[in-house]
Amino acid sequence: MKPLGNSNLRILIADDQTDVLEALRLLLKAEGFHIEQATSPAAILAAIEARDFDVVLMDLNYSRDTTSGQEGLDLLSRIQAIDSILPVVVMTAWGTVNLAVEAMRRGARDFIQKPWENERLLSVVRTQIELSQALRRGLRLEAENRLLRAEGRPALIAEAPSMEPVLQLIARVGPSDAN
């Protein structure tokens, strides 16, 4: 697979196991992504509050001998409160259908079972980035449209001095019954 060539795309990868972080870093960096890492729920939240990310890939378990995924599920709700559009893809080696459903219910955009397949992981990451970018573009356009339609804003914008005679003519003819 060829690299995307876009190092402007920033991914936060989060896991308490350094070998998992390193494997993800190598895979994603080879695809042209800028990678940041976190090893705890507190570090994840701090990173998200400090910087913008295009996607978060995060483990669900951070404490030793924990396989319930509860830490990650609780973290999902907190991430959603910070940025509800940020796509979060959760990962775990202890996945069940119930855990996947609960993660999605709390805001995860996808669920990846460890060990992962590289092609599927890359496909999920790309898809989530594209969907997030489209959603953010749509929200920006909605905001621009609201501004453009705001009351008191002229329907015609013409600032050049050469347009002054045209605007005067429109002002005279506009209120008349002429067609």
Give the ranges of each region predicted by the language model.
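Two-component/phosphorelay signaling modules centered on CheY-like receiver
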Residues: 2, 18-42
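Acidic, metal-coordinating helix/loop segments flanking the phosphotransfer/catalytic sites
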Residues: 12, 37-55, 64-67
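C-terminal output helix
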Residues: 42-43, 98, 112, 116-125, ...
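Short amphipathic alpha-helix used as the core "switch/output" element in two-component signaling
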Residues: 46, 61, 65-84, 102
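AAA+ ATPase active-site-proximal loops
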Residues: 146-179
